[in-house]
C-alpha cells in the first residue's frame, strides 16, 4: 500500500470528516488518494494555509471532533503556525499533516527545505506549538505514527499534533496495514464551574 493511500484510509477509519489545506508540490502524493475517499473525507481548500489551521481549530471548538490540516513544504507549512498555536492555547485537537522534501534529498535544499540547523527541519518550527511532532521517513513507520498522533490529539488536554511527511513517503509502497482504532473521542468538554459562571 502506498503511503498516501494508507493516510487516506486512516482518515476514513478515524472518522475525520474534513481535511483543510492547500494543494502543493510537496503533498501531491496524498491528493489522488483523498479524491478516492472523497465521499468520506472532504478536502476543503481555503485561500491561505493559516485559514486552514483556524478552520480546523474552529471545527473542534464546535463539534469536539478532530480534523486535519494539509500543507505543502516550506512556506506552505510555515503559514499554519499561528493557527496551530491558537489551537494549542485553546486545547483544540488538530492533526497537522505537513509535507516535506524527499528523504533522498534531505539537506540539499530542495522545495524550500528548512535545513539551517538540522536536515528537513520543519518539525522544529512547530514544536513549540504542538503537543508532539512526528516525522516518519518510511511508509512502514506510518501506521504507528498515525495511531500515536491521533490518539495524542484527544488524550489528556486536547491539542494539535504534527505529522511531517517527506514527499517520497506519500508515493512509496510497503506491506503494512493500519493499526486498529482505539476510539479515544470525547463528545464534550469539561464544563466551567457554575459558581464562577454566576460571578461572571
Locate each region found by the language model.
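N-terminal alpha/beta PP-like core and its mobile active-site loop of ThDP/TPP-dependent enzymes
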Residues: 1-200
Amino acid at each position: 500500500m502506498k503511503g498516501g493511500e494508507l493516510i487516506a484510509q486512516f482518515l476514513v477509519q478515524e472518522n475525520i470528516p474534513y481535511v483543510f489545506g492547500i494543494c502543493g508540490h510537496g503533498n501531491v502524493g496524498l491528493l489522488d488518494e483523498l479524491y478516492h475517499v472523497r465521499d468520506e473525507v472532504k478536502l476543503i481548500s481555503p485561500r491561505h494555509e493559516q485559514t486552514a489551521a483556524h478552520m480546523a481549530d474552529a471545527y473542534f471548538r464546535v463539534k469536539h471532533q478532530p480534523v486535519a490540516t494539509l500543507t505543502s513544504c516550506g512556506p506552505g507549512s510555515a503559514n499554519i503556525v499561528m493557527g496551530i498555536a491558537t489551537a494549542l492555547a485553546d486545547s483544540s485537537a488538530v492533526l497537522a499533516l505537513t509535507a516535506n522534501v524527499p528523504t533522498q534529498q534531505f539537506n540539499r535544499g530542495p522545495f524550500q527545505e528548512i535545513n539551517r540547523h538540522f536536515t528537513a527541519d520543519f518539525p522544529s518550527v512547530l514544536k513549540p506549538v504542538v503537543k508532539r511532532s512526528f516525522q516518519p521517513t518510511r511508509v512502514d513507520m506510518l501506521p504507528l505514527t498515525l495511531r500515536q498522533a491521533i490518539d495524542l490529539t484527544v488524550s489528556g488536554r486536547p491539542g494539535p499534533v504534527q505529522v511531517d511527511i517527506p514527499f517520497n513517503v506519500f508515493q512509496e509502497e510497503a506491506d503494512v496495514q493500519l493499526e486498529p482504532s482505539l476510539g479515544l473521542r470525547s463528545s464534550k468538554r469539561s464544563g466551567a464551574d457554575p459558581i464562577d459562571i454566576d460571578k461572571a
